[in-house]
């Protein structure tokens, strides 16, 4: 309690008549201090706040204006061409961000791996893998729990409107394509193409020769020997004449090598990891390459600093254009509306509950200021619907806004934007069970477990591009024998849900970077000491060896997380 409060209580105990006067003096002093603080805030703090949060305020304002503008223009029923013209500024933002994704993934991953020793890389890689697996499994569990409790698929699917067409992809081919894309045969081609199995039909003709008694002719006719009599020869001839020759032709679907447009981010990440590890192992011989990629990464981030000022304008027109493209807003109601609500509740529980809780339990810090620091990245994710396109903004928010170590962001974010898809995993598991519900298909525990495992694995293969979850959902449905054509029932709202799950993906990547940084403080400090104090010679080396030995002794009883 303040001294004014103490003097007030003293006056209360000494003289009852002075109590009211003391209370009045105390209130006047507090009011004066509050008035002075408000005056100071209006002159300095508000200006500093606006300057520090200009990007966030502009982006939030762009979202509000975009939604309002879209609903104001909907009564005019713009044509598809007019909507595309209207959305052109948003398309420019997408192209700018996608232009930076390729050099940013390669440069950040190479520098991140080259700046760490092999032991530190191994420990941080294990922590990242555990974090990715734990959060993805939790997301799948939340999705299954929500769709089981709310049961949005109750009723018939006859009232649901179908949109589009879904290509059926065998599960084995999809996972083989994932592994193939990890090892691109041509790095130049990997910059704009991915391997994708395609299918063609061929006519197969088979000739079947059967005898009249249904057996194949085969060795039933043999050349006559001298011991055979005329009767046996006649029997063989009769049997040969009684054979039937049948030609059967049928079509067969066969897999053939193909490709799909888009950056093979997974293959580039794998190559960049290996290349960065090799450069880091070369020590001083690899310094030139390390400096090159570090300078490239710095140049890309400066370009991001320029493009970020255009982001609010692009987000405004992206969101407005998508709302204008919706033919019927009524699809958000009824049975499909319950499905949409179920997905939103699940994503909110994971993004607003589980991920902040993990951050708090590991770092013992309030997670919500951290989430506020990446708000612009989250809004950009909502506008672009692509975690890869949001990657430049995410780097800037974490490194410059929140001060996360660059070695961690370069190590974690490119991989996270490719394989850590919490929102996608939750969505795929929930959507698969929803489709089972609308078909009145009862799933047993084994099938639900299969959906969980398949959704977790398929989310890893979902590239950070818009609506990739619809493609990987085919794998989940095929695993339990559900009709893949029923994916068309939920396409009408996928454009909206895709933005929400992309925000969840970006939030999961960002919190993962903060968690791994907190757990890797000892390795980062030792690595920084080795890089900044090399001139101390042998005494320094012996001191660092002792520090490493003590670190291993303390860390031997610790878990990876």
Curated annotation (Swiss-Prot):
Sites of Phosphoserine modification: 2
PROSITE patterns, per database record: NA_DICARBOXYL_SYMP_1 (PS00713), NA_DICARBOXYL_SYMP_2 (PS00714)
Catalysis performed (reactions): K(+)(in) + L-glutamate(out) + 3 Na(+)(out) + H(+)(out) = K(+)(out) + L-glutamate(in) + 3 Na(+)(in) + H(+)(in); K(+)(in) + L-aspartate(out) + 3 Na(+)(out) + H(+)(out) = K(+)(out) + L-aspartate(in) + 3 Na(+)(in) + H(+)(in); D-aspartate(out) + K(+)(in) + 3 Na(+)(out) + H(+)(out) = D-aspartate(in) + K(+)(out) + 3 Na(+)(in) + H(+)(in)
Alphabetically ordered keywords of this record: Amino-acid transport, Cell membrane, Chloride, Glycoprotein, Membrane, Metal-binding, Phosphoprotein, Potassium, Sodium, Symport, Transmembrane, Transmembrane helix, Transport
Transmembrane segments: 53-73, 96-116, 130-150, 259-282, 292-319, 341-362, 408-434, 495-516
Binding residues for L-aspartate: 385-387, 424, 465-469, 498, 505
Positions bearing carbohydrate: 213, 229, 236
InterPro entries: DAACS, Na-dicarboxylate_symporter, Na-dicarboxylate_symporter_CS, Na:dicarbo_symporter_sf
Residues reported to bind Na(+) 2: 418
Sequence positions that bind Na(+) 1: 416, 420, 505, 509
GO terms (BP aspect): establishment of localization in cell; L-aspartate import across plasma membrane; L-glutamate import across plasma membrane; L-glutamate transmembrane transport; neurotransmitter uptake; regulation of membrane potential
Membrane topology: Multi-pass membrane protein
MF GO annotations: glutamate:sodium symporter activity; high-affinity L-glutamate transmembrane transporter activity; L-aspartate transmembrane transporter activity; L-glutamate transmembrane transporter activity; metal ion binding; monoatomic anion transmembrane transporter activity; neutral L-amino acid transmembrane transporter activity
Compartments where located: Cell membrane
Position of the signal peptide: none
Intramembrane parts of the chain: 368-398, 448-481
Residue numbers on the Cytoplasmic membrane side: 1-52
GO cellular component terms attached to this protein's record: glutamatergic synapse; Golgi apparatus; membrane; membrane protein complex; parallel fiber to Purkinje cell synapse; plasma membrane; postsynaptic membrane; presynaptic membrane
Family statement: Belongs to the dicarboxylate/amino acid:cation symporter (DAACS) (TC 2.A.23) family. SLC1A6 subfamily.
PANTHER family per UniProt: EXCITATORY AMINO ACID TRANSPORTER 4 (PTHR11958:SF67), SODIUM/DICARBOXYLATE SYMPORTER-RELATED (PTHR11958)
Subunit structure: Homotrimer.
Role, per record: Sodium-dependent, high-affinity amino acid transporter that mediates the uptake of L-glutamate and also L-aspartate and D-aspartate. Functions as a symporter that transports one amino acid molecule together with two or three Na(+) ions and one proton, in parallel with the counter-transport of one K(+) ion. Mediates Cl(-) flux that is not coupled to amino acid transport; this avoids the accumulation of negative charges due to aspartate and Na(+) symport.
Comment block on domains: Contains eight transmembrane regions plus two helical hairpins that dip into the membrane. These helical hairpin structures play an important role in the transport process. The first enters the membrane from the cytoplasmic side, the second one from the extracellular side. During the transport cycle, the regions involved in amino acid transport, and especially the helical hairpins, move vertically by about 15-18 Angstroms, alternating between exposure to the aqueous phase and reinsertion in the lipid bilayer. In contrast, the regions involved in trimerization do not move.
Protein's UniProt name: Excitatory amino acid transporter 4
Organism: Rattus norvegicus
Lineage: Eukaryota, Metazoa, Chordata, Craniata, Vertebrata
